[in-house]
Amino acid sequence: MFVSLSEKKKFLTWLVNTAPFGRREVLWILNYLLTHDAILNNVHFVENVEKTDRGIRVVADGLGKEPLLLFIQAQEFTDPEQIFHEIRMNWRKALYLECVFPEAWQTSQYLSVLEDNPFAPWNEQVDQEVARAIDQYFKQEEQTQRMALLKAQIDDALETGNKEAFLELSDELNRLKQQ
């Protein structure tokens, strides 16, 4: 998914003005990103940033997590100056940013910039039981749709007097019902 620079700026502006960040360094870094297009072009908003090769997590107050954390190759850094230096010196590299704030999933501004984390894709994080339930649902839905189509074709065969098609389609419908 491609997220435009203007969408990123719109989100960061909203985040800076709305989310309650207790450490001023968080706001400094977000504002720095906001005012440097070349860097912001390489920023990707993701979840599970700790799984990326280079990412930052910013956390709003009251959520019980470190408010500012840099991850580089599974190592953690909390020093704001070191984090700023990393951003500034490696501005050409992709930077993954996770923003943790209350009701993030109910916020359209956040959802409009959220991308799939290439290091931890969403579809690989689905519980196996949930995946089986989803697969079962789609199989059932496919069978329901197939039965509806067969019934419509049987009706057409009756209306046109096509006895052979009627018998063939009826047999297929009966086989589907027995599954």
Swiss-Prot record:
Q: Which domain of life is it from?
A: Bacteria
Pfam families xrefs: IDEAL, UPF0302
Taking the record's annotation, the residue ranges forming a coiled coil are none
- Disulfide bond entries: none
Entries under HAMAP family matching the protein? UPF0302
Belongs to which family? Belongs to the UPF0302 family.
Name of the molecule in the record: UPF0302 protein EF_1554
